[in-house]
Structures are given as C-alpha cells and as structure tokens.
C-alpha cells in the first residue's frame, strides 16, 4: 500500500473515532471487520466497471447494520473509490481503541507451549513493563528459539530467547 493511502486511511480512522462515542468504538470496529470479511476480495465492489450506485445498493442490502456512521463511511469510500482502504482503516481504528483503553497487543513466541498459568504470568509481566491496563497476547510456538521468549508489539521487539543470546555471543566471538 502506498504511503499516501496509509495516510488517507489514518485520516478516515481518526474521523470515525472522533464521530463515534468512545464506548461504541469496539462494536464499530467489530462491525467493520465483519463487513470487510464479507466483501473480501469481491471483484464487484472493487471493479471500476460497476457503477457506484450499484455498489451502494448491493452494500445496503447486504449490510446487517443500521449504524449510520458505518453506512456513510462505506458510501464515502465507494464515492471516492477508496474501498480498498477499509483494511488499513480497521488497523488504524484498532490502534486508536488500544490507545484509549491503554491496551497493548503482543505476539509472544516461545519454544514450547505454555499452560494458562505461565501465559497469565507473562501477561502480568507485560502489563507492568508497558504500564498497560490490558494485554492482548497471541501466544505462538517457535521451536527454533531453543528456550525463552520473543515478544513483538507494534513498537518493540523483546528477544530473550536462547537463540538470540547465542547469536549475540557468536557475533562477539567473531569480532
């Protein structure tokens, strides 16, 4: 995606978040995700050969929502031929919601599967580290790490894996 499209998607997400009540943002995001999944890669909605009016009619009949803000946003995207930005708008809106709720999303990679107690301990540690109210952690297994954890957030990568430590040691010994 071009940087100008990312900037434009960010502007749409800012407009959405400023027009909606903060408490309604999570449900708004969920509805947009559902709509994005429903229209997916449909050539109908993205084809320049299909008139805007037909796209709007099809979207209106397919939408389960009565949310005025969602309908108008989608119609505006269709009018401006920017429906392809919906995925990025959802990503940006999710980041906005996370900042409002002081939530951090993290991918946690570990060499072996962790039980619930271990996962909760990692989540509590991340809450303290990031001074966050909530942590959305996605735990994944990566056997190449040997042991330890590797944590990725939007802004940070924390690598406490044995694999990383061995690579650092190798680098030091080679220098």
From Swiss-Prot:
InterPro entries according to UniProt: ATP_synth_OSCP/delta_N_sf (IPR026015), ATPase_OSCP/dsu (IPR000711)
Molecular function per GO: proton-transporting ATP synthase activity, rotational mechanism
Statement: the UniProt record of this protein carries the keyword Cell membrane: yes
UniProt superkingdom: Bacteria
Keyword Isomerase: no
Any one GO CC term of the record: plasma membrane
Coiled coil: none
Topology of the protein relative to the lipid bilayer: Peripheral membrane protein
Compartmental location: Cell membrane
Pfam families: OSCP
Gene3D superfamilies reported in the protein's UniProt record: N-terminal domain of the delta subunit of the F1F0-ATP synthase (1.10.520.20)
Keywords: ATP synthesis, Cell membrane, CF(1), Hydrogen ion transport, Ion transport, Membrane, Transport
Assembly and interaction partners: F-type ATPases have 2 components, F(1) - the catalytic core - and F(0) - the membrane proton channel. F(1) has five subunits: alpha(3), beta(3), gamma(1), delta(1), epsilon(1). F(0) has three main subunits: a(1), b(2) and c(10-14). The alpha and beta chains form an alternating ring which encloses part of the gamma chain. F(1) is attached to F(0) by a central stalk formed by the gamma and epsilon chains, while a peripheral stalk is formed by the delta and b chains.
Function: F(1)F(0) ATP synthase produces ATP from ADP in the presence of a proton or sodium gradient. F-type ATPases consist of two structural domains, F(1) containing the extramembraneous catalytic core and F(0) containing the membrane proton channel, linked together by a central stalk and a peripheral stalk. During catalysis, ATP synthesis in the catalytic domain of F(1) is coupled via a rotary mechanism of the central stalk subunits to proton translocation.
Family matches, as HAMAP family: ATP_synth_delta_bact
Homology family: Belongs to the ATPase delta chain family.
Protein name: ATP synthase subunit delta
Gene this chain is encoded by: atpH
